[in-house]
């Protein structure tokens, strides 16, 4: 996977406008929907247990986000996930705040046990706590980077869960059971916008809907999103996170194949 291939995935999302079913948290629903629309995908947010299975089976991808979870929402996620699995729809999990409370951590693990996942996207602490590495710092749902080798963590998590792991942060690390890539795009202002990471997970879903290899889809999605964020930060350099948030939506709509080819920094890591 290189910048040129990532750029072509972006074009495929816009060409096919995949339906992304996001069972997400109530803090970020509007921002996520608008971000997917800006990108060129088609969002739907359906939460009721009575309809999630029917919605998931017609979607291009299903995204599960535990940011504001409840027993009922986790049940709905598992119902939707099983339906997606039955119909060949890729499922992406965002274990928001895993490690903050036992209920949150166990909810993420319950979903992983019950649903076959194409990818999991989170920060290092969320991924570490989801797979049982406990010596990482976390505060609420804003997880700290903790300590340790993030590349090794991504490898171990991918092998343990047999899925693509995307750990996002200052440097993004994407791994499957055999390969590891690092990505070097994005901007620090993303950490000042509530829901920027949650939107990114749904963007990964949109790319998984058009690219059958979830590793490549995650790389292309996170690279394209990171480039859009850099361009948005340039445009709002003398302003604050409010202006950046709006400009990020603008740039998700206008970022081009050429932008991604020029700006995306994708490196394959040699692992032993």
From Swiss-Prot:
Gene Ontology biological process terms, A to Z: thiamine biosynthetic process; thiamine diphosphate biosynthetic process
EC class (word): transferase
Protein name: Hydroxyethylthiazole kinase
Residues that span the membrane, as ranges: none
Free-text comment on the cofactor: Binds 2 magnesium ions per subunit. The first is coordinated via water, the second is coordinated to ATP but its significance is unclear.
Quaternary organization: Homotrimer.
Function in brief: Catalyzes the phosphorylation of the hydroxyl group of 4-methyl-5-beta-hydroxyethylthiazole (THZ).
E.C. code: 2.7.1.50
Record-linked InterPro entries: Hyethyz_kinase (IPR000417), Ribokinase-like (IPR029056)
Binding of ATP, residues: 121, 168
Impact reported for residue 198 to S: Reduces activity by 80%
């Amino acid at each position: 996977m290189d910048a040129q291939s990532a750029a072509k995935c972006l074009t495929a999302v816009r060409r096919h406008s995949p339906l992304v079913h996001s069972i997400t948290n109530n803090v970020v629903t509007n921002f996520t929907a608008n971000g997917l629309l800006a990108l060129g995908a088609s969002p739907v947010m359906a939460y009721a247990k009575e309809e999630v299975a029917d919605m998931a089976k017609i979607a291009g991808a299903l995204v599960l986000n535990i940011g504001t979870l409840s027993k009922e929402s986790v049940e709905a996620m598992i119902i939707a996930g099983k339906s997606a699995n039955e119909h060949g729809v890729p499922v992406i999990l965002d274990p928001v705040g895993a490690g903050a409370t036992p209920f949150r951590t166990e909810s993420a693990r319950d979903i992983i046990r019950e649903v076959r996942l194409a990818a999991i996207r989170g920060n290092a602490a969320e991924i570490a706590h989801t797979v049982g590495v406990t010596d990482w710092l976390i505060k609420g749902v804003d997880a700290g980077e903790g300590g340790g080798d993030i590349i090794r963590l991504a490898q171990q998590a991918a092998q343990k869960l047999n899925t693509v792991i995307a750990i996002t942060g200052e440097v993004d690390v994407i791994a499957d059971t055999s390969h590891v890539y690092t990505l070097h795009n994005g901007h620090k202002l993303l950490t000042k916008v509530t829901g920027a990471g949650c939107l990114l997970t749904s963007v990964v879903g949109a790319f998984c809907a058009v690219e059958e290899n979830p590793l490549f889809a995650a790389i292309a999605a996170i690279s394209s999103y990171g480039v859009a964020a850099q361009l948005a930060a340039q445009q709002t350099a003398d302003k604050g996170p409010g202006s950046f948030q709006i400009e990020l939506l603008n740039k998700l709509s206008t970022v081009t194949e050429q932008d991604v080819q020029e700006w995306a920094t994708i490196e394959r890591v040699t692992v032993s």
